[in-house]
């Protein structure tokens, strides 16, 4: 065997060694590349060798650190060709694109409602299960979403860190500020595919869409009457509890609905 044949055989052997799958000794999972196995094994060891110089957060992969650093730099390299909106990660861009395409791959097994994002489906499913995993340490009130708990906690602290540059109004969460700013800009990015009506908030669009579908997700536990909105169920439930939270400061009379209080106050104004 000459030197060129030996060299070819050695090269062929290295290719075969590289292609041979590597097995994780902890969980038995196979990987085609040794580097992928090395990254995977950090899950078992809890090893996070890539450290953010800005805040000290640690990561298992260099790619995860690179993605995280965009929080500090504000870099958003992934741009939507439809609306020019930009994002920090490709995954978020893919989710955003479904707003334009109308694709909703995540479907609820209970009611068939579909969503463009997996987290939206998980949040929705809590309507059916009644699960409220996020609990306030101050008052014990529980919530189905972490963002609702965060917003609620600011009701105890009074913190409103998000301020409108146009009018100075402050809010306890950034989403509320973004929604408010659409009053000034006139932007209504959420459009009904049935009738073309546009809304400033996605939640308003979701509620509106139920007028077309007839869907009523919110059910009274006392009389089983159903409603399209949680707010309507809450108002209805006061019939059973007798609660009248809206009090007239003029005469002390109380009402179940704010609209009833307003009508009553006009009687005083006309006196």
Swiss-Prot record:
Domain of life: Eukaryota
Chief location category: nucleus
GO biological process: Golgi organization; regulation of cytokine production; regulation of immune system process
Subcellular location: Nucleus; Nucleus, Nucleolus
Entry keywords, A to Z: DNA-binding, Metal-binding, Nucleus, Repeat, Transcription, Transcription regulation, Zinc, Zinc-finger
InterPro entries in the cross-refs: Znf_C2H2_sf, Znf_C2H2_type
Function in brief: May be involved in transcriptional regulation. Essential for Golgi structural integrity.
Full protein name: Zinc finger protein 501
Organismal lineage: Eukaryota, Metazoa, Chordata, Craniata, Vertebrata
């Amino acid at each position: 065997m000459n030197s060129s044949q030996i060299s070819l055989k050695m090269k062929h052997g290295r290719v075969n060694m590289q292609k041979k799958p590597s097995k994780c000794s902890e969980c038995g999972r196979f990987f085609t590349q040794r580097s992928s196995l090395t990254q995977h094994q950090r899950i078992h060891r809890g090893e996070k060798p890539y450290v953010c110089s800005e805040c000290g957060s640690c990561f298992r992969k260099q790619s995860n650190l690179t993605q995280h650093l965009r929080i500090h730099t504000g870099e958003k390299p992934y741009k939507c060709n439809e609306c020019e909106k930009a994002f920090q990660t490709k995954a978020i861009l893919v989710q955003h694109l479904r707003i334009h395409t109308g694709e909703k791959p995540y479907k609820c097994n209970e009611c068939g409602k579909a969503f463009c994002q997996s987290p939206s489906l998980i949040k929705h499913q809590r309507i059916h299960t009644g699960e409220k995993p996020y609990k306030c340490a101050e008052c014990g009130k529980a919530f189905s979403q972490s963002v609702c708990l965060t917003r609620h906690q600011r009701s105890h602290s009074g913190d409103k860190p998000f301020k409108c540059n146009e009018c100075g109004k402050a809010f306890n969460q950034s989403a509320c500020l973004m929604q408010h700013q659409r009053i000034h800009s006139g932007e209504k990015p959420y459009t009904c595919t049935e009738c073309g009506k546009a809304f400033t908030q996605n939640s308003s669009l979701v509620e509106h869409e139920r007028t077309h579908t007839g869907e009523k997700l919110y059910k009274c536990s006392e009389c089983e009457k159903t409603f399209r909105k949680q707010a309507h169920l809450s108002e209805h439930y006061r019939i059973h509890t007798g609660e009248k939270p809206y009090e007239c400061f003029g005469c002390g009379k109380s009402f179940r609905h704010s609209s009833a209080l307003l009508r009553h106050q006009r009687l005083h104004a006309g006196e």
